[in-house]
Curated annotation (Swiss-Prot):
The keyword Lipoprotein does not apply. One of its GO terms (molecular function) is DNA binding. It comes from Burkholderia cenocepacia (strain ATCC BAA-245 / DSM 16553 / LMG 16656 / NCTC 13227 / J2315 / CF5610). SUPFAM superfamilies: GAF domain-like, Winged helix' DNA-binding domain. InterPro entries: GAF-like_dom_sf, HrcA, HrcA_C, WH-like_DNA-bd_sf, WH_DNA-bd_sf, WHTH_HrcA_DNA-bd, WHTH_transcript_rep_HrcA_IDD. It comes from the Bacteria. Negative regulator of class I heat shock genes (grpE-dnaK-dnaJ and groELS operons). Prevents heat-shock induction of these operons. GO terms for biological process: negative regulation of DNA-templated transcription. Belongs to the HrcA family. The gene is hrcA. This is Heat-inducible transcription repressor HrcA. Pfam families: HrcA (PF01628), HrcA_DNA-bdg (PF03444).
């Protein structure tokens, strides 16, 4: 545990480093901390913080900078999110960008764009997962022995399957089959529907059972679409000296964007937690670049978490500004998708 004096000095150091990007010396800490301490006392406290792994000393400067561990303590226990931005203006911009009624993929892509524009860093969104259950199905007769199966998921995603049947079905028979499935099985997975059909087979005519089994088989044979990571504003990070000043670091950053595997894992981890999460660079393999951090939040459709969004930027970012941007965007994206 840090005593109040050490906490104040660490908080001041990190705030000044975020603002100025320069190692922070004892004179700056004396000026901004509000504490009446001698330079020698401040240096002693800094030495203690360095031994604790909360700050480090660059070789080229007498000042100190925060470590990933120092940033973690700061965002977990010292950060006050009183955004220096107009939250209502941010909400209006997000609402104007996310238009209800647009295709889901377009709305999600717009969320990545607005995150990038507001933060001036990179916006990232893990698109909604394909549902394993269905809300409604329809059969449409195309020709003799060819039927179009239309599946609507709870998220509003529409999927089509072609069915080749051993016999022809009339429109009224197709309506009867879809009405039965929607009335008895909506909200279940197709594996559950298959099990239920076995139990109820005696209640159905043989030709209807054949059609329903064909629909269930076609639905489960198609592999799930892979989770997709959408990124907007990568070029903004070229303007961030902390990330772009070193060519090896820059190459590693764009490898993260190109491969997306690490981002997918990070966003998936975030989707299992409530509210805003902050991933500090260098803390774990999830964020392999010490100078990069990610602020994320899950978003929902009708109360169910379906994806994650966030901002990728430098570890030296104004967290009190970025956190509300991510939080507001996640809430309004959830609202927009739930209204579709």
């Amino acid at each position: 545990m840090l005593d109040p004096r050490a906490r104040t000095l660490l908080k001041t150091l990190i705030e000044r480093y975020i603002a100025d990007g320069q190692p922070v010396g004892s004179r700056t800490l004396s000026r901004y901390s509000g504490l009446e301490l001698s330079p020698a006392t401040i240096r002693n406290v800094m030495s203690d913080l360095e031994e604790l792994g909360l700050v480090s000393s660059p070789h080229t400067s007498a000042g100190r900078i925060p470590t990933p561990r120092g940033y973690r303590l700061f965002v977990d226990t010292m950060l006050t999110v009183e955004a220096p931005i107009d939250a209502e203006a941010v909400a209006r911009q997000v609402q104007n960008t996310l238009q209800a009624g647009e295709p889901q993929q377009r709305v999600v892509a717009a969320a990545a764009s607005v995150l990038s524009n507001l933060s001036q860093f990179a916006g990232v969104v893990l698109t909604p997962r394909r549902s394993h259950v269905f809300k409604q199905i329809e059969f449409m007769r195309l020709s003799d022995k060819r039927i179009l199966l239309i599946i609507v998921t709870p998220e509003g995603d529409v999927q089509n399957r072609m069915l080749a049947t051993p016999r022809d079905y009339s429109p009224s028979q197709l309506t009867e089959a879809s009405n039965y499935i929607n009335a008895h099985f909506a909200g279940l997975s197709f594996d559950e529907v298959r099990r239920r059909l076995r139990d109820e087979i005696d209640q159905l005519r043989g030709d209807m059972t054949t059609l329903m089994h064909a629909a269930v088989t076609a639905s489960t044979e198609v592999p799930d679409t892979e989770d997709t990571v959408l990124i907007s504003g990568e070029r903004n990070l070229l303007e961030v000296a902390d990330l772009s000043s070193d060519m090896a670091r820059l190459r590693k950053l764009f490898d993260v964007f190109d491969q997306k595997t690490g981002l997918l894992q990070l966003l998936d981890v975030s989707s299992h937690a409530q509210g805003v999460q902050i991933f500090i660079g260098g803390e774990s393999t999830l964020v392999p670049i010490e100078e990069m951090s990610v602020v994320t939040a899950p978003y929902e459709v009708n109360g169910k978490i379906v994806g994650t969004l966030g901002v990728i930027g430098p570890t030296r970012m104004a967290y009190n500004r970025v956190i509300p941007i991510v939080d507001i965007t996640a809430r309004l994206l959830s609202l927009t998708l739930s209204q579709q």
